[in-house]
Regions:
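Flexible "arm" and connector segments at domain edges
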Residues: 1-104
Length: 104
């Protein structure tokens, strides 16, 4: 078995057999956690000097929750049969579409 690159999103197989409603629930759960951390981050930024420990901690928590959302999406794609190569192709297509739209 190949070594897992822990610096890239890896699909979690625990929910591989989940039905659509369960996937949606998991995605909503993780998205709600990201929303809560985003609100917390905004509040802390408004009330603290930039670069303080509180701001940096809140930023890290938000980043981790956003990464959890990415991981759920990668896991769901994996469960749908999109391995890393197929997910890479999807990313390329979406990036090309976004480039044409002038998003970057």
């Amino acid at each position: 078995m190949a070594e897992i690159d822990m610096t890239k999103p890896q699909p979690c197989t625990k929910f591989r057999d989940a039905d659509t409603v369960e996937w949606i629930a998991k995605l909503m759960e993780e998205t709600n956690e990201a929303i809560q951390e985003a609100e917390n981050y905004e509040m802390i930024c408004k009330n603290a000097a930039a670069g303080t420990g509180d701001v940096l901690d809140a930023k890290d928590r938000l980043a981790e929750e956003l990464t959890d959302v990415i991981t759920v999406c990668v896991s769901w794609l994996d469960a749908l049969g999109y391995d890393e190569a197929k997910r890479g192709e999807l990313n390329r297509r979406v990036n090309e579409k976004n480039e044409k739209r002038g998003y970057f």
